């Protein structure tokens, strides 16, 4: 009987810690706004057609107007905020993700574990982000590794393009 009480106490403490962490992130999200990162991203990458094929895009050099340490990319529209939070510790802001096109991705910048910008919608009908998304359809990349090349998608007959992560040696 003592073991059962002990187990319940452990689960209770873990539950309280998880709830406190969730509430802390929820409070941090309330201060998310349009930022210079959003403006810089839109200026550099939208519309997608203005990107040059076979060109490298180093996010740490392009997006230097404010501090950030990770970029978080989520594939639309199948976004489960709770599942992503449990897996990654990143709480996505409330947004109508379901009504987004399947060809869209949402880009977020993270600083000290908190998202610091509103969702940036990125993609198009002939764009595919080909970068080992996990089962939750997200990709989390540290700033120093956020280096991409814009190129034609190799396995496509339809002229699809991709922003492919350049693997660091």
What are these regions (language model features)?
Residues 128-169:
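C-terminal partner/receptor-binding element of secreted or periplasmic proteins
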Residues 9, 107-110, 149:
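Compositionally biased, low-structure terminal segments
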Residues 15-18, 92, 126-127, 162:
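Polar low-complexity intrinsically disordered regions enriched in Ser/Thr and small residues
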Residues 1-5:
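Positively charged n-region of N-terminal signal peptides that target proteins for export
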Residues 56-126:
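Mature extracytoplasmic domains of secretory-pathway proteins
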Residues 8-9, 14-88:
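N-terminal export/targeting and maturation segments
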């Amino acid at each position: 009987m003592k073991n059962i009480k002990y187990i319940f106490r452990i689960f209770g403490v873990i539950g309280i810690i998880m709830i406190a962490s969730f509430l802390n992130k929820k409070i941090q999200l309330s201060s998310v706004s349009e930022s210079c990162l959003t403006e810089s991203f839109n200026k550099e990458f939208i519309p997608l057609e203005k990107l040059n094929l076979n060109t490298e895009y180093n996010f740490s050099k392009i997006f230097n107007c404010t501090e950030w340490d990770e970029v978080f990319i989520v594939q639309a529209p199948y976004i489960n905020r709770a599942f992503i939070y449990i897996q990654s510790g990143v709480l996505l802001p409330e947004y109508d993700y379901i009504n987004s096109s399947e060809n869209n991705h949402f880009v977020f910048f993270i600083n000290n574990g908190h998202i610091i910008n509103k969702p940036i919608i990125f993609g198009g009908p002939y764009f595919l982000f080909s970068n080992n998304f996990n089962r939750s359809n997200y990709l989390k990349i540290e700033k120093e590794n956020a280096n991409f090349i814009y190129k034609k998608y190799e396995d496509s007959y339809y002229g699809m393009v991709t922003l492919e992560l350049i693997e660091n040696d």
